[in-house]
A protein has these predicted regions:
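Membrane-embedded transmembrane alpha-helical bundles that form the catalytic cores
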Residues: 1-469
Length: 470
């Protein structure tokens, strides 16, 4: 079940709203239980056989969290956090990487069979959430959660369960115990959810057709290859940020406030800035739980480079068990090292437009690695972008450019902080009309977007979120 499906919008969500809000606010435990039950049902709809795996992950992190608490001796606390890391990452490693490493072993020793393992939905996300809780307890950054049901709600809460953002326990710990739902909060959450739904249905799914056509073409022309790469650059942003918007909006409807996961990354003027704005919950997770414990940048240059290499190798591997993702992570490692130690100062002296062009060109290249099925396919596509087909234009690029130019233009505008600039301008005017627009404008716009999105939903084909496979 996905947020942009009829079953979720027409059946799951309305039933949850009715059961949740019919319970009086003072019965917080009952409301939490309803959220937990629906979250488990939500996950079971996508992979019922893996529901036990997620429950096992919850039990592991609950027990290890108790061991890592301050009441125990240091050796017991270390054992608790170590056990959580070994078991949690062990399960993640088996289900996500057994096939990948098995294929490499099979190539060297054909008598070793390749494990046939199905990847559970959202395992990368709920594993990282559970592990961060135990580590925070061990560091005394979070209190031990003694209620297994409350910890289960934190790990399995359906808005961010299968595709993020990765929510820290400290972000929602107080709201699990005591939160204040209101009409204004519910309304703001609904508007955020509907804007995310529109991103997915009206923009991401549209440009996905261009990207799919270009990447599946046997020998695309130069312009078609570039159009496909740019289209996928828009697709992955509007697809993933749409899910984050919808998750943040849903959480807010129930009184939870998740941190932002994107901050207009395509306005960045460097790769360093890009990663401060893109998938913020993942980059900060690796910063706090891998990079800083390794020594961060408070060490020699050689050690700092090694720390960054480890982080970006793991970042690539986290996204998937393939050489494409590993090379994708190492691509950003090279660029970040270059900006930090080689050409960063020279880059900062360039005009802003050139800085932006440099950043987006390198980001587009990175998404080719991300989108291609194999490393060989990525290299072939790069060759097509620089003329290997011998055709510069071709009929297909003309067709797709004419067919999808409105969506591509909307993507260009929506990738900019236009909404923020408009809100700032209206707030500065501080007139009766501007205040009315600030209050009613987003609500009216979200209703219009809901109508358009629903039309696409009932007439279009199923197109799952990209990050579901991670």
């Amino acid at each position: 079940m996905v947020f942009s499906s009829v079953s979720f919008l027409v059946f799951f969500l309305p039933c949850l709203f009715v059961l949740y809000f019919i319970v009086p606010h003072r019965y917080r435990g009952a409301r939490n239980f309803i959220l937990l039950a629906f979250s488990l049902a939500f996950y079971a709809c996508g992979g019922p056989k893996f529901l036990l795996l997620m429950l096992l992950s919850i039990v592991i992190n609950y027990c290890c969290g108790l061991l890592a608490g301050p009441k125990h001796r240091p050796t017991v606390r270390k054992a608790g956090v170590t056990l959580a890391a070994v078991l949690g990452l062990g399960l993640l490693g088996w289900f996500k990487y057994a096939g990948f490493f098995g294929e490499m072993l099979h190539a060297l020793m054909p008598f070793i069979p390749v494990p046939q393992v199905t990847l559970p939905i959202g395992i990368s996300f709920f594993t990282f959430q559970g592990l961060s809780y135990v580590i925070d307890v061990f560091r005394d950054d979070a209190a031990v959660q003694k209620s297994p049901l409350k910890l289960a709600l934190y790990i399995s809460f359906f808005p961010q369960l299968v595709a993020g953002p990765i929510v820290r326990y400290t972000t929602v710990a107080e709201e699990i115990d005591e939160r204040h739902e209101s009409v204004s909060e519910f309304s703001a959450g609904a508007v955020r959810f509907l804007f995310g739904l529109a991103k997915k249905m009206l923009l991401a799914n549209a440009v996905a057709q261009v990207a799919d056509a270009a990447f599946s073409a046997a020998s695309p022309s130069v312009l078609f290859a570039w159009l496909g790469a740019v289209s996928y650059t828009f697709q992955i942003y509007f697809d993933f940020s749409a899910y984050s918007d919808m998750a943040i909006g849903l959480g807010r409807m129930f009184g939870f406030h998740f941190l932002e996961n994107f901050n207009y990354p395509y306005v960045s003027r460097s790769i360093t800035e890009f990663w401060r704005r893109w998938h913020i919950s993942l980059s900060t997770w690796f910063r706090d739980y891998v990079y800083i414990p390794l020594g961060g940048n408070r060490c020699s240059r050689a050690r700092n480079i090694l720390n960054l290499f480890i982080v970006w190798f793991l970042t690539g591997l986290w996204h998937g068990a393939s050489w494409n993702f590993i090379c994708w992570g190492l691509w950003f490692f090279v660029l970040l090292i270059g900006e930090k130690f080689v050409w960063g100062k020279a880059l900062s002296r360039l005009p802003a437009l050139l800085q932006h062009f440099y950043t987006m060109l390198l980001v587009v290249f990175s998404w080719v690695l991300f989108r291609a099925d194999t490393l060989g396919a990525a290299l072939t596509y790069f060759a097509a972008m620089f003329g290997s087909s011998g055709v510069f234009c071709g009929e297909r690029v003309i067709y797709y450019a004419l067919e999808f130019w409105p969506e591509l233009l909307c993507c260009c505008v929506a990738a900019l902080p236009v909404k923020t600039l408009l809100e700032t301008a209206l707030e500065e005017r501080d007139s009766r009309i501007s205040r009315a627009v600030l209050i009613a404008g987003p609500k009216l716009a979200s209703l219009a977007l809901l109508t358009l999105s629903y039309c696409k939903l009932v007439t279009g084909s199923f197109n799952p979120f990209i990050y579901f496979r991670f």
